[in-house]
Amino acid sequence: MSPLAAFEAVADIRPQRAIHTLRDVAPLPNSLAFAASPVKTANAQFLADALDVLLRQSPPDEDLSDFLFDAVAHFAAAEGAATANFNASFFYHLTYFLGISPNLEGEGSVFDLRSGSLAPAPPLHPDYVAGDDCDALRALARVPLRHCGMLRIPRADRARALDTILRYYSIHIAPLDSLASLAIVRSLFT
């Protein structure tokens, strides 16, 4: 099975065991889409690596689980622009569930990555974006993940938007720039 593949299984969970046993494992239908596409498989590996870092210390959260399950199903069915825009849109919308959602409403032409909000002028630190990069983040904020294929973001702007969001996570949760799978995804989508 590929990373992020959803499956059904019977689990034998015993409190005394550190490792639990699974049997009768069967992939769910949308999981087969990853196996058919090398691009989606590479992207699923990156998402799994990033989620491992970001969610390592997270307590169980049903809303987050629902979001992740729905997002993976959407990505499995995505084609064209929806596939290309998925990473940036997914990581932007994931911020809501991790309690670090940026505030992109109101006036301001600069997004301060440390405060997570718009500002009228650049801050005194280097962690901010402005211009087209700020506009790309606003576009991601306006469009729900399931409609990310409707976004018309040029390839270079999309790559910078993803880099900005990953920097945002690095500031607020954990660094993601050292993931080996990130280089592969960058070569595919940038």
Set out the residue ranges of the language-model regions.
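Non-catalytic alpha-helical scaffolds and adjoining flexible linkers that form interface surfaces
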Residues: 1-190
